[in-house]
């Protein structure tokens, strides 16, 4: 016999115990990051390595968001300077296309970024959708979540109540949906705009500039920033996603009294 003697119940018990212990530990987190795209994973990585208890909530079964495809059906992705410094730290190889513009493999960057966030200590609830937010004393205090496939079932045949998870801070890194912020906007608690037409150069700068707290306890990062503030669409380039996630982590880290690391200067600006 090649493998150890283990039966079906042993396997199920191992999965169940691991899930239970992780979920129980993160019923109360320092930070809940909603969305496991490039901005969310970067924020989770930076906060977790600084010592924060971080939970990532992702509606899909996979992590990485749009990083798997760089545009249309093609999987090379582009990064504009100075964001390649994060690729240097992740040890993701890239090539210079022209001064200030770099190209790398999307699946490799997605895998490396997800691995780094998890290695730093962040936990993930995948196949988990945001249903609502917890607001207490005019401050976001957590999220309300459910199993993602529930939303695809007719109301007539299912009634599955969501559950609440608390956190000191929530990061809306849900991309074009900006779903966390829009839950508040639907109630008139914040204003949320619509995405403008594409303008890569302007959009990336503005996304990083506008990354921040949109409501007490809620920080918006990544393309969700463009959606909330009506910024130009940035198109298939990812530098602002990485730097926005890093900035979100730094802002929250400062509030929590944590020293959040920022990547070193780029190895190359060629």
Curated annotation (Swiss-Prot):
InterPro entries associated with the record: FAD/NAD-bd_sf (IPR036188), Thi4_fam (IPR002922), Thi4_prok (IPR022828)
Residues that coordinate or bind glycine: 233
Domain of life of the source: Archaea
Protein keywords: Iron, Metal-binding, NAD, Thiamine biosynthesis, Transferase
Gene Ontology terms for molecular function: cysteine-dependent adenosine diphosphate thiazole synthase activity; iron ion binding
EC number: 2.4.2.60
Cofactor field: Fe(2+)
Post-translational modifications reported in the UniProt record: During the catalytic reaction, a sulfide is transferred from Cys-159 to a reaction intermediate, generating a dehydroalanine residue.
Catalytically driven reaction(s): [ADP-thiazole synthase]-L-cysteine + glycine + NAD(+) = [ADP-thiazole synthase]-dehydroalanine + ADP-5-ethyl-4-methylthiazole-2-carboxylate + nicotinamide + 3 H2O + 2 H(+)
Gene Ontology biological process terms in this record: thiamine biosynthetic process; thiamine diphosphate biosynthetic process; thiazole biosynthetic process
Pathway: Cofactor biosynthesis; thiamine diphosphate biosynthesis
Listed PANTHER family: THIAMINE THIAZOLE SYNTHASE (PTHR43422:SF3)
Role played: Involved in biosynthesis of the thiamine precursor thiazole. Catalyzes the conversion of NAD and glycine to adenosine diphosphate 5-(2-hydroxyethyl)-4-methylthiazole-2-carboxylic acid (ADT), an adenylated thiazole intermediate. The reaction includes an iron-dependent sulfide transfer from a conserved cysteine residue of the protein to a thiazole intermediate. The enzyme can only undergo a single turnover, which suggests it is a suicide enzyme.
Record note on quaternary structure: Homooctamer; tetramer of dimers.
Record-given protein name: Thiamine thiazole synthase
């Amino acid at each position: 016999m090649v493998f150890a003697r283990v039966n079906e119940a042993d396997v199920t018990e191992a999965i169940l115990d691991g899930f239970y212990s992780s979920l129980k530990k993160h019923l109360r987190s320092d930070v809940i990051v909603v969305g496991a795209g490039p901005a969310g994973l970067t924020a989770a990585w930076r906060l977790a390595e600084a010592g924060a208890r971080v939970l990532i909530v992702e509606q899909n079964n996979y992590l990485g968001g749009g990083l798997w495809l760089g545009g249309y059906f093609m999987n090379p992705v582009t990064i504009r300077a100075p964001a390649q410094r994060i690729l240097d730290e992740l040890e993701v190889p890239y090539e210079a296309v022209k001064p200030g513009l770099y190209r790398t493999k999307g699946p490799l960057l997605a895998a490396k970024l997800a691995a780094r966030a998890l290695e730093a200590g962040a936990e993930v609830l995948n196949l988990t959708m945001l249903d609502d937010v917890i607001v207490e004393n005019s401050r976001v205090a957590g999220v309300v979540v459910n199993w993602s496939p529930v939303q695809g079932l007719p109301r007539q045949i299912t009634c599955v109540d969501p559950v609440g998870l608390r956190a000191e801070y929530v990061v809306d890194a849900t991309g074009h949906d900006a779903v966390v912020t829009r839950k508040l906007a639907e109630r008139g608690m914040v204003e949320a705009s619509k995405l403008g037409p594409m303008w890569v150069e302007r959009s990336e700068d503005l996304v990083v500039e506008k990354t921040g707290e949109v409501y007490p306890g809620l920080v918006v990062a990544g393309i969700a920033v463009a959606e909330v503030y009506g910024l130009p669409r940035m198109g298939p380039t990812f530098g602002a996603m990485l730097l926005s996630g890093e900035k979100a982590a730094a802002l929250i880290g400062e509030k929590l009294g944590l020293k959040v690391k920022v990547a070193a200067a780029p190895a190359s600006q060629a």
